[in-house]
């Protein structure tokens, strides 16, 4: 059974949920092998084994860890050359997609980004599903050249724990001078909000122009659900919420199990960032709002009335 490489997404050895999802997907395609770049492997090993990693390639060279994405792509390209994997799975984050693109060029392979499903292809290979053209179409695709390089959106699979050996192998890589032109000079930890990361959250509650700048009801409802908080571009441009929380074509793309849009009209730019959500709920006073065209459930009403009622109902259900 051919190896399937999974690039580990972690912070100092704390493995993110996206990695357990990718390891679960990798088991559909072959034998999962994790690629761990950076420090903190001892803390990560158990989590990688828990979700089926049979092997872990460790890349700890400062030439890779002290620079931005280019050395990581070079290291992966060398590993692809030696391991000849059936596919490479990478988280579809901003950094992940850049690594994937560089890797595809270096290995002369086909690239698929923002996949929301990955399955074995008919007659071999890999088949993916993704949303394209600002969410206007859902398509299936396969890579026809080289090693399939696939960037997968968070929440594309439910993590399934299966014990793996996680036998580690230290990999020595050579990084070209051309890849070391952007050095990391400082790292600042992100301030904790008490809420899940927007792109990884299973539930996202977003507010738009309809909030009038008051996100308190959106935040209260999100907190009752253990959800992340998002915002439309209109709300961000008005200065009501940080750009780091913007969902849409020029913000972050999310694909949670549940997406709640409160006071958001549903312009195509916003839909491009959330249309692959598994279940979509909208709350809007305007019954003609475009957002109602793609929702699973819609509530025509004032979010300042609807959301507090929903928050109390959630709290009551939790006891």
PLM regions: where:
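N-terminal glycine-rich FAD/FM-binding segment characteristic of electron-transfer flavoproteins
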Residues: 1-319
């Amino acid at each position: 059974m051919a190896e399937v490489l999974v690039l580990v997404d972690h912070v100092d050895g704390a493995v993110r949920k996206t990695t357990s999802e990718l390891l679960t997907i990798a088991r559909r395609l072959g034998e999962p092998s994790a690629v761990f770049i950076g420090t903190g492997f001892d803390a990560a090993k158990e989590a990688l084994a828990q979700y089926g990693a049979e092997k872990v390639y460790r890349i700890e060279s400062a030439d890779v860890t002290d620079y931005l994405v280019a050395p990581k792509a070079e290291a992966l390209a060398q590993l692809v050359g030696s391991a000849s994997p059936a596919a490479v799975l990478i988280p579809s984050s901003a950094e992940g997609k850049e690594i994937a693109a560089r890797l595809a060029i270096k290995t002369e392979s086909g690239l698929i980004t923002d996949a929301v499903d990955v399955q074995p292809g008919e007659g071999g290979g890999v088949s993916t599903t993704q949303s394209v053209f600002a969410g206007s179409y859902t398509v299936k695709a396969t890579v026809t050249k080289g090693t399939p390089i696939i960037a997968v959106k968070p929440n594309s699979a439910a993590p399934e724990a299966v014990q793996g050996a996680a036998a580690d192998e230290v990999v020595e890589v050579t990084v070209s001078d051309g890849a070391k032109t952007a050095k990391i000079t400082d790292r600042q930890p992100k301030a904790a909000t008490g809420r899940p990361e927007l792109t990884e959250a299973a539930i996202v509650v977003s507010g738009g122009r309809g909030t009038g700048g008051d996100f308190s009801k959106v935040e209260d409802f999100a907190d009752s659900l253990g959800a992340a908080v998002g915002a439309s571009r209109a709300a961000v441009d008005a200065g009501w919420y940080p750009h780091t929380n913007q969902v849409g074509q020029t913000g972050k793309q999310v694909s949670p199990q549940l997406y709640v849009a409160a006071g958001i009209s549903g312009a195509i730019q916003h839909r491009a960032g959330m249309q692959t959500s598994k279940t979509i709920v909208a709350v809007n006073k305007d019954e003609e709002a475009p957002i109602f065209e793609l929702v699973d459930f819609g509530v025509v009403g004032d979010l300042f009335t609807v959301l507090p009622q929903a928050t109390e109902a959630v709290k009551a259900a939790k006891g």
